[in-house]
Amino acid sequence: MAWSSLLLTLLAHCTGSWAQSVLTQPPSVSGAPGQRVTISCTGSSSNIGAGYVVHWYQQLPGTAPKLLIYGNSNRPSGVPDQFSGSKSGTSASLAITGLQSEDEADYYCKAWDNSLNA
């Protein structure tokens, strides 16, 4: 059986123009159906490393971005457990297990300073 490769395109997302803090993501990640892929999000000591929380969004073609992970590793209601998030040091990652064709999308990471909510 031939496996068609999936391509997950990624776009870097800024934490906010006032902060001028940039997060770096790879331009693309690919995997075969059923596989596990990990998408990295690299920040710095002024954002992720400073304790900012990381959120992940999925944008399917022709649709608005959907929140996948909030607060580093929490899934909103309705998001399947094939998606998981983690954070370590100045980087974060989104893991997708059991890759499916419908997972082909743009994925964004965002770092947020929770102290702004206080």
From Swiss-Prot:
Immunoglobulins are composed of two identical heavy chains and two identical light chains; disulfide-linked. InterPro entries: Ig-like_dom, Ig-like_dom_sf, Ig-like_fold, Ig_sub, Ig_V-set, IgV_Light_Chain. Probable non-functional open reading frame (ORF) of V region of the variable domain of immunoglobulin light chains. Non-functional ORF generally cannot participate in the synthesis of a productive immunoglobulin chain due to altered V-(D)-J or switch recombination and/or splicing site (at mRNA level) and/or conserved amino acid change (protein level). Immunoglobulins, also known as antibodies, are membrane-bound or secreted glycoproteins produced by B lymphocytes. Residues 71-73 are annotated as: Complementarity-determining-2. The keyword Zinc does not apply. This is Probable non-functional immunoglobulin lambda variable 1-50. It comes from the Eukaryota. Residues 1-19 form the signal peptide. GO terms for cellular component: extracellular region; immunoglobulin complex; plasma membrane. GO terms for biological process: adaptive immune response; immune response. Residues 74-109 are annotated as: Framework-3. Disulfide bonds join 41-109. Residues 20-118 form the Ig-like domain. The gene is IGLV1-50. It is found in: Secreted; Cell membrane. Residues 45-53 are annotated as: Complementarity-determining-1. It comes from Homo sapiens. Residues 110-118 are annotated as: Complementarity-determining-3.
